[in-house]
């Protein structure tokens, strides 16, 4: 009666899937499985209810297929409750358990204790690569020649490369790479390490570069290369061949493209499954599980400890059946983890605990189907036992949850463990916003044992939604990156995992998560905490419904449009859409139904103008009476009109005319009244506007108008901050007051003690206390009493009267206590006063704060302010009026500022003129004495300068939009008024002083002008008479004394007049200079103020921009760009400086050649030209030590060897690497500006400086990438083999090894585009060419040949312009000459010179150095003068200049010059000073 049920997965008679089909024969069962079922019998064939055994994979060909139970892919056939043919029901049946004294086992559990079980792990979606080398071994094979050939991997079927374009290579290159890849791998999907090595070695690149390329290319670390990885390796080889550097880390875009294509290829590789079996009539349950082929597999859980048989007997539940064969599932988790599509199997009727009550099956020759087992009426499906024994009770199927009823990928329909999701409530409590959430988080308690599917259950979704709502307090509908960092950071996961989870949860790169995306992120975190890896791609089950529905809607719309266009094109409806008569409205539905709610409605495609339906004019249609529709039918009105006579109609017309006239009259009266009201309102509005204008003018012209602040909100906030600052100071001041009061009280007590001790010398109060706080202890009293007794005894012995009777201790204590009480009372009174002041200050501050809060702008007030001040939402007239008022206010404000600036500048100019006139006065003591009583003192000038400084500061603050600090004692208006009065007084005094000074100066000038004229007139009339006596005094015998005296007097008068004129000129010049100086200072001050103001404005703008954007990253980028630009500018300046030095060196060279010509003329025969040959190879290169093969030098005394300058080489390295570092910086910054992942931003916000890779550092890079572990790079050992020996330790002088190494690598060979260093590989490749791999190698050689740059160029020449100078071309140009330090002897100078000088000229001194002094006569012969001191550190060498040919016919001069450079002394320097080279050194 249940045979027609199709409710479970479409199988006939499948309502009870564990039971055999009704009225059909059960296949025979044998103990050892030797009898095969008779699949073809006459009549009805036996229908097995299980699956045919898949013997080919597990080697169980001798076993019989079981009727029900688990598939035999992993367990042995088992019997399900019937003894079958076997007459021994007590024998052990092969049901999966080992042989034991137990009864016949009918359950469906496998033998978990058997040894020969084959466990196939879950598929990793990557081609199985068994029996081959690892990536590390392949990497080592590139460094080691002797490596065993690995066994080839099993070839996967179908080597199809996905049709996906890689953006980092061109389409032509990708096609070439695909051809090369296919020719190399054949039908396989992956290229082995050896094959990749053979192909990549044809690039002729060094092993270090190939090692780094392999590290970057082998993204899966599997020792093989899929096509995208191979294309990436070829791309990196192309980069290195063309001279560019290999990046240390792949860019994000390239890495994402390669990993995505690798995943696609991996998903296309089929799982390793057993061979298919013969087709049977068993229903197939594979289809629902194979619908979603691209979904990642269900996560495989770590295998728990296998239970024993007794534990299995106590834990047995209903047995599921119908499980599809799969190679990736384990039998011990089938009940909880693999129960999709399974129902409990009833193997024995309840109550029939043993098999004796069951009917044995009738098997064999009968044609009719025989019932087996229980033959009674078929009951409903109750919970059934599994037939183990009578002690077992019927087990419920509570371990299984609801079956999936939705489509795959639908949220909320998924099987979860019956015991609930492990520790997800703990995760929810951990991630809820709560105090102390900044602490650490431990994932130790979140490790569950349940196998969680990819999809999110309803319970999980509810928990995640609660978390989202708890964190989304403002109900924005999303959670930003910062909040997500705080939430997800509490999970304790690594930042890389959180970054990957964010990338999966935020597919649109919005930088925030909505509710569904947040649920995805939380689910991935939960799975990661339970030990499952984060997937590379978001599984289809985890795609949020919002995103999926949106994509489906877009696809539906596109399909609708395309189908509509195709339909109209096919039917010809697009030609005349108005005549088709087909409504497309009902077809445009997202629900897919043929009839939509709007189907009865007509759209524009069905519109047709119906002229016949147009009705005539109906007067009743003019007006509607309320909401009751039209007036009564016009038929009645027509009948009534026909009954009226003409007179009646005329009467009605007259009455209607009268009524219309009355209505018109009323309308005219109403219009007149409205006009009158409008005129009155207009007049009132104009009067109000006039009043408003006057009030605004009064406000603008008021002296305190500058104090008016339109930004009341900002001012209110400023006042509130000031009030808060003052409130914060109140407790501190109160504590200071209390401390002072306490000190005053202590001082009063101490003073009272001193006074009391003076008044009562013998009092006990005179005791000095040594206790804490000066308290008098008992020991102090004992000492005082002993001292008093000693004093009395001393007085008695001395015969003095005994001291007065001591005051008792009680009296002293009473006096002290009284004073203490008085001081304490006064202190308490003051303390209470302080508390009162504090409370009053708090109340006052509270009232002020309340008043400030009351004045805050509400929404209504803000609306009103924007309406009446910003003219938003008002009429045009009012808006124009408001704009006019604003313009008038701004004009008045600007005019007032100009007036105030002019008035402030005028006194300043007067003061400056006053100072100018004061400074311009002559400085004789008499003039100072005349103006000694000046009212402008030094204090006044200091005050004026301070005022000017304060005014400038205030102006700058006002220009910057800041408010000056107001004085707490007086208001701003009072202070301005006081300063204005003081300024006016100072201006008045300055004007008076200027007037007095000017009068004094005019008077003095007039007197000085009169004095020379009188003095010039006096010698003519008065001086000659006294002259003879003076002459007679000097020489009385001289007859011409009078004439001489007269001439002397005239000469003295002229001299005095000239002296006066000179003094006047000097005074005028001094005045002019002083005036210019003051003007210059004033101009400098103004320029400084303008510059400071500009800088302040620039800083303010920068701060505002930073606050508005909040992106510190842009500043960092700007700083880097500026540094790069600055470095480039410095490099240009350095090059220009070097060119200038080169020109100076050439000029100096010419001078030295002239000196050498003179030297040759003056030299003797014995010191003739020394034949010294300077071969090319011995010419010192850049920072290179001269080789030992040079000509011997003359013996010289031993001198200390000084280190040559080692500056040019590091600078050159920096200069050459600066473009590469800037390029690397730009490369690292490009993806950062695109991604909004907050973890990625946090990683990138911490700058990482990557050193630019240089050729000597390549082995170090490769070694640091693979520490302590076996390298997976196939090029590692090749790099070690090809690596040159390490350079020797750095000597005091630079050697030329590094530049020469660069030169050999940079130069292209004559006949080939590749370096000849790897020529042996080509010969070995030719020997190893085979039929299978020859074409691939030839293609690789062709490809790498096309990658090479043009032949005249080289890889190192294209890196940077400054690197060209690092490779010297010998004999082609004049290299620069560095400056010579003072402490270096000539030989060391020659050794340490950075660039090689050409044979003719010697190294000249630096151009900025002064020439050394010539040797004096006292200097010993043969000692050259010392070289000039170095003026600047040596610069890096500039690019080589044009070739300069040596002077023809001057080989002797060259040889002599070389000897001079080597330190040879000249003998005849005392005869010819020009013979000594200024660049030669002196032995110290």
Curated annotation (Swiss-Prot):
Residues 205-240, 493-528 form the EF-hand domain. SMART domains: EH (SM00027), WH2 (SM00246). Residues 811-866, 894-913, 937-955, 975-1010, 1063-1152 have a biased composition (Basic and acidic residues). This is Actin cytoskeleton-regulatory complex protein pan1. InterPro entries: EF-hand-dom_pair (IPR011992), EF_hand_dom (IPR002048), EH_dom (IPR000261), WH2_dom (IPR003124). Component of the PAN1 actin cytoskeleton-regulatory complex. The keyword 4Fe-4S does not apply. Residues 1-16, 49-67, 352-370, 628-639, 1175-1187, 1265-1274, 1356-1371, 1472-1484 have a biased composition (Polar residues). The keyword Cell membrane applies. It is a peripheral membrane protein. Residues 17-47, 306-316, 1209-1222, 1382-1393 have a biased composition (Low complexity). Keywords: Actin-binding, Cell membrane, Coiled coil, Cytoplasm, Cytoskeleton, Endocytosis, Endosome, Membrane, Repeat. It comes from the Eukaryota. One of its GO terms (biological process) is endocytosis. Residues 1157-1169, 1310-1329 have a biased composition (Acidic residues).
């Amino acid at each position: 009666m249940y045979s027609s049920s199709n409710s479970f997965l479409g199988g006939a008679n499948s309502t009870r899937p564990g039971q055999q089909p009704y009225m059909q024969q059960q296949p025979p069962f044998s103990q050892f499985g030797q009898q095969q079922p008779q699949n073809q019998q006459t009549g009805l064939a036996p229908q097995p209810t299980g699956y045919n055994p898949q013997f080919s994979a597990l080697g169980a060909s001798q076993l019989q297929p079981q009727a029900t139970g688990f598939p035999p892919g992993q367990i042995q056939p088992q019997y399900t409750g019937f003894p079958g043919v076997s007459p021994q029901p007590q024998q052990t049946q092969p049901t999966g358990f080992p042989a034991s004294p137990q009864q016949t086992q009918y359950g469906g559990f496998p033998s978990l204790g058997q040894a020969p079980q084959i466990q196939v792990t879950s598929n990793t979606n990557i081609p199985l690569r068994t029996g081959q080398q690892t990536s590390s071994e392949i990497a080592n094979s590139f460094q080691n020649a002797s490596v065993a050939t690995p066994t080839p991997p099993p070839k996967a079927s179908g080597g199809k490369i996905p049709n996906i374009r890689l953006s980092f290579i061109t389409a032509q290159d990708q096609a070439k790479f695909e051809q090369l890849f296919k020719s190399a791998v054949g039908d396989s999907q992956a290229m082995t390490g050896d094959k990749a090595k053979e192909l990549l070695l044809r690039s002729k690149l060094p092993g270090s570069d190939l090692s780094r390329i392999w590290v970057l290319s082998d993204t899966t670390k599997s020792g093989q290369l899929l096509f995208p990885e191979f294309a990436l390796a070829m791309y990196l080889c192309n980069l290195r061949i063309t001279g560019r550097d290999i990046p240390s880390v792949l860019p994000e875009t390239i890495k994402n493209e390669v990993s995505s294509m690798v995943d696609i290829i991996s998903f296309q590789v089929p799982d390793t499954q057993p061979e298919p079996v013969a087709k049977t009539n068993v229903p197939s349950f594979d289809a629902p599980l194979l619908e979603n082929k691209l979904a990642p597999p269900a996560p495989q859980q770590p295998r728990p400890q296998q239970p024993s048989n007794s534990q299995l007997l106590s834990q047995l539940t209903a047995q599921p059946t119908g499980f599809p064969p799969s190679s990736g599932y384990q039998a011990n988790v089938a009940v909880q983890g693999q129960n999709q599509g399974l129902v409990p199997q009833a193997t024995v009727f309840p109550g029939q605990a043993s098999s004796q009550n069951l009917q044995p099956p009738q098997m064999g020759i009968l044609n009719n189907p025989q019932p087996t087992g229980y033959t009674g009426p078929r009951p409903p499906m109750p919970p059934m036992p599994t037939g183990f024994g009578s002690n077992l009770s019927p087990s419920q199927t509570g371990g299984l949850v609801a079956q999936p009823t939705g489509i795959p990928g639908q949220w909320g329909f998924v099987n979860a463990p019956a015991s609930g999701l492990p520790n997800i409530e703990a995760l929810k409590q951990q991630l809820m916003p709560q105090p102390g959430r900044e602490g650490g988080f431990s994932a130790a308690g979140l490790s569950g044992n349940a196998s969680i599917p990819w999809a999110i259950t309803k319970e999980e979704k509810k928990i995640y939604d609660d978390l989202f709502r708890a964190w989304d307090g403002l109900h924005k509908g999303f959670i930003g990156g910062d909040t997500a960092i705080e939430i997800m950071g509490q999970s304790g996961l690594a930042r890389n995992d959180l970054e990957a989870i964010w990338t999966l949860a935020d597919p649109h790169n919005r930088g925030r998560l909505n509710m569904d995306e947040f649920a995805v992120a939380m689910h991935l975190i939960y799975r990661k905490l339970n030990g499952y890896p984060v997937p590379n791609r978001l599984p289809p089950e985890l795609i949020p419904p919002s995103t999926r529905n949106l994509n489906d809607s877009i696809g539906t719309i596109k399909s609708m449009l395309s189908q509509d266009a195709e339909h109209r094109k096919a039917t010809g409806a697009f030609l005349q859409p108005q005549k088709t008569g087909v409504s497309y409205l009902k077809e445009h539905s997202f629900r897919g139904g043929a009839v939509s709610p709007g189907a009865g409605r007509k759209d524009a495609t069905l519109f047709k103008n119906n002229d016949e339906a147009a009705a005539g004019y109906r007067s009743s249609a003019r007006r509607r009476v309320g909401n009751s529709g039209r007036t009564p039918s016009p038929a009645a009105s027509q009948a009534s009109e026909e009954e009226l006579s003409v007179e009646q109609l005329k009467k009605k017309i007259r009455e209607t005319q009268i009524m219309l006239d009355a209505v018109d009259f009323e309308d005219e009266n109403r219009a007149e009244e409205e006009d009158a009201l409008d005129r009155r309102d207009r007049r009132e509005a104009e009067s109000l506007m006039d009043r408003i204008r006057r009030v605004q003018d009064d406000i603008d012209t008021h002296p305190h108008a500058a104090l008016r602040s339109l930004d009341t909100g900002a001012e209110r906030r400023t006042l509130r901050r000031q009030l808060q600052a003052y409130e914060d100071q109140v407790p501190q001041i109160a504590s200071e007051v209390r401390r002072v009061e306490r000190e005053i009280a202590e001082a009063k007590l101490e003073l009272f003690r001193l006074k009391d001790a003076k008044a009562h010398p013998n009092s006990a109060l005179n005791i000095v206390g040594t206790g804490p706080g000066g308290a008098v202890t008992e020991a102090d009293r004992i000492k005082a009493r002993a001292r008093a007794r000693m004093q009395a005894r001393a007085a008695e012995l001395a015969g003095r009267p005994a001291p007065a009777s001591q005051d008792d201790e009680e009296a002293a204590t009473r006096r002290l206590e009284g004073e203490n009480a008085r001081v304490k009372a006064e202190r308490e009174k003051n303390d209470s006063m302080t508390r009162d002041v504090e409370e009053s200050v708090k109340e006052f501050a509270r009232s002020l704060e309340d008043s400030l809060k009351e004045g805050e702008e509400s929404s209504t007030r803000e609306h009103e302010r924007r309406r009446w001040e910003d003219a938003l939402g008002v009429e045009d007239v009012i808006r124009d009026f408001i704009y006019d008022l604003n313009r008038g206010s701004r004009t008045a404000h600007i005019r007032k500022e100009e007036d105030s600036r002019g008035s402030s500048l005028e006194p300043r100019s007067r003061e400056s003129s006053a100072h100018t006139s004061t400074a311009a006065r002559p400085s004789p003591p008499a003039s100072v004495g005349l103006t000694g009583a000046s009212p402008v003192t030094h204090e006044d000038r200091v005050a004026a300068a301070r005022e000017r400084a304060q005014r400038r500061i205030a102006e700058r603050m006002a220009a910057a939009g800041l408010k000056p600090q107001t004085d707490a004692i007086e208001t701003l208006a009072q202070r301005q008024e006081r300063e204005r009065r003081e300024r006016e007084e100072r201006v008045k005094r300055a004007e008076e002083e200027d007037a007095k000074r000017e009068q004094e100066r005019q008077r003095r000038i007039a007197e000085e002008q009169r004095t020379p004229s009188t003095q010039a007139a006096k010698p003519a009339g008065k001086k000659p008479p006294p002259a003879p006596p003076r002459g007679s005094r000097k020489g009385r015998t001289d007859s011409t004394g009078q004439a001489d005296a007269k001439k002397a007097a005239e000469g003295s008068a002229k001299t005095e007049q000239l002296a006066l004129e000179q003094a006047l000129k000097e005074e005028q010049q001094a005045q002019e200079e002083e005036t210019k100086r003051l003007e210059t200072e004033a101009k400098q001050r103004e320029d400084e103020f303008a510059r400071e103001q500009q800088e302040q404005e620039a800083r303010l703008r920068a701060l505002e921009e930073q606050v508005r954007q909040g992106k510190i990253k842009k500043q960092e980028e700007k700083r880097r760009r500026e540094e790069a630009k600055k470095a480039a500018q410095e490099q240009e300046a350095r090059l220009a400086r070097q060119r200038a030095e080169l020109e100076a060196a050439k000029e100096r060279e010419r001078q030295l050649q002239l000196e050498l010509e003179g030297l040759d003329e003056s030299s003797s025969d014995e010191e003739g030209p020394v034949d010294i040959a300077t071969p090319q190879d011995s010419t010192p290169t850049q920072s290179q030590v001269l080789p030992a093969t040079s000509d011997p030098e003359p013996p010289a005394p031993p001198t200390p060897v000084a280190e040559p300058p080692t500056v040019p080489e590091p600078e050159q390295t920096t200069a050459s690497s600066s473009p590469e570092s800037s390029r690397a910086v730009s490369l690292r910054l490009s993806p950062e500006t695109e991604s909004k992942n907050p973890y990625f931003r946090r990683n990138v916000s911490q700058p990482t400086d990557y050193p630019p890779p240089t050729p000597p550092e390549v082995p170090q890079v490769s070694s640091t990438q693979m520490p302590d572990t076996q390298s997976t790079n196939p090029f590692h050992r090749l790099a070690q083999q090809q690596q040159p020996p390490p350079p020797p330790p750095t000597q005091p002088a630079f050697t030329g090894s590094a530049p020469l190494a660069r030169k050999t690598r940079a130069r292209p060979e004559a006949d080939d585009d590749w370096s000849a260093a790897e020529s042996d590989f080509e010969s070995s490749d030719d020997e190893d060419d085979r039929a299978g791999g020859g074409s691939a190698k030839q293609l690789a050689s062709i490809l790498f040949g096309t990658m090479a740059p043009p032949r005249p160029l080289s890889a190192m020449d294209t890196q940077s312009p400054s690197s060209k100078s690092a490779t010297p071309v010998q004999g082609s140009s004049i290299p620069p000459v560095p400056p010579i330090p003072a402490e270096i002897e000539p030989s060391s100078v020659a050794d340490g010179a950075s660039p090689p000088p050409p044979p003719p000229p010697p190294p000249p001194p630096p151009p900025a150095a002064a020439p050394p002094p010539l040797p004096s006569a006292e200097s010993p012969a043969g000692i050259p003068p010392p070289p000039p001191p170095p003026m600047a550190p040596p610069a890096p060498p500039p690019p080589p200049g044009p070739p300069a040919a040596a002077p023809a016919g001057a080989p002797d001069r060259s040889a002599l010059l070389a000897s001079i450079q080597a330190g040879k002394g000249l003998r005849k320097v005392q005869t010819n000073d020009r013979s000594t080279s200024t660049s030669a050194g002196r032995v110290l």
